[in-house]
Amino acid sequence: MRTRHGAFLLLARPATERAHTPEQDQYTLPTLTHLDRLEAESLHILREVAAECEKPVMLYSIGKDSAVMLHLAMKAFYPARPPFPLLHVDTGWKFREMIAFRDRKVKELGLELLVHMNEDGVREGVGPFTHGSAYHTDVMKTAALKQALDKYGFDAAFGGARRDEEKSRAKERVISFRSAGHRWDPKRQRPEIWNLYNTRMHKGESLRAFPLSNWTELDIWQYIRREGIELVPLYLAAPRPVVTWNDTLIMVDDDRVPAEIAAKAEVKSVRFRTLGCYPLTGAVESTATTLDDVIQEILLTTTSERQGRAIDKDQTASMEKKKQEGYF
């Protein structure tokens, strides 16, 4: 067909009439599953931050989200190792199984692990039983994290937080900026359009990056099953000594539990949906001993996975206040 200017216009035939050859099948893009898309997004975030920032680090809390994030980091930079170390802020009150798992896993992968503890808090004898969850978290987690970031000069820290976990995390950006004092101002967050991330910082600022922002608890568990990711055994049900303390079912993990509390302990079949300091992490009664059992439980549950975390109950909007002060 010729236009009035003399040029030829080729008219495309309707899709139903277009010729198709078997050779074209090899160029057809594969259909990505829901988990494939989440994985691709996370890999992009990891590579983007690693490329744009001078000295990134990955926060490693030893939990299921950290396990998934570490697995993604190993994929993102394969066959090389991740171009950043792992940082574990040790409060001194983690489950013994967590610490043993951490040391073994890091050794197996051949990664650099930095462990930091707030020595001022240790000298003061700060602990959840003696000082309460709010003060313990502020000194042994928040202050310790800021100390470590300043000590090593990191300008970016990867974290495993997800938006479905808690209200303040739901409104935080994938790339979350911190002031020179590591404070977060939710009113000054930058817009994030599609998958375009602005990592530019003013002098003294730093950022936190959350590759798992758009994942849900169910996504995490389905990905763990698909990828065969190893976890701390505490996530699966087993007979464990537990006692109710401050309306939370906690595990008696060592002899630092006050005698009057430990004396009331009973052995029950329990597991943990989230892990932290053992006196501040509630267990749930469960018979889920396999990944399939856990996934089935999650499909039927009507409560948040963080319902057993004492630090989320300190006061109204406690998590947002902690994040503004520099918490993970």
UniProtKB/Swiss-Prot annotation:
Keyword tRNA processing belongs to the record: no
Pathway: Sulfur metabolism; hydrogen sulfide biosynthesis; sulfite from sulfate: step 1/3
Cysteine disulfide partners in this protein: none
EC number annotated for this UniProt entry: 2.7.7.4
Reactions catalysed: sulfate + ATP + H(+) = adenosine 5'-phosphosulfate + diphosphate
Annotated region (Disordered), positions in chain: 309-328
Highest taxon in the source lineage: Bacteria
Keyword Transcription: no
Pfam families, per database record: PAPS_reduct
Leading EC class: transferase
Single GO molecular function: sulfate adenylyltransferase (ATP) activity
Entries under InterPro entries matching the protein: PAPS_reduct_dom, Rossmann-like_a/b/a_fold, SO4_adenylTrfase_ssu, Sulfate_adenylyltrnsfr_sub2
Keywords: ATP-binding, Nucleotide-binding, Nucleotidyltransferase, Transferase
GO-annotated biological processes: hydrogen sulfide biosynthetic process; sulfate assimilation
Family according to the record: Belongs to the PAPS reductase family. CysD subfamily.
NCBIfam families: CysD, PRK05253.1, PRK12563.1
The protein's role, per its UniProt record: With CysN forms the ATP sulfurylase (ATPS) that catalyzes the adenylation of sulfate producing adenosine 5'-phosphosulfate (APS) and diphosphate, the first enzymatic step in sulfur assimilation pathway. APS synthesis involves the formation of a high-energy phosphoric-sulfuric acid anhydride bond driven by GTP hydrolysis by CysN coupled to ATP hydrolysis by CysD.
UniProt subunit comment: Heterodimer composed of CysD, the smaller subunit, and CysN.
Family matches, as HAMAP family: Sulf_adenylyltr_sub2 (MF_00064)
Record protein name field: Sulfate adenylyltransferase subunit 2
Organism listed in the record: Hyphomonas neptunium (strain ATCC 15444)
Taxon lineage: Bacteria, Pseudomonadati, Pseudomonadota, Alphaproteobacteria, Hyphomonadales
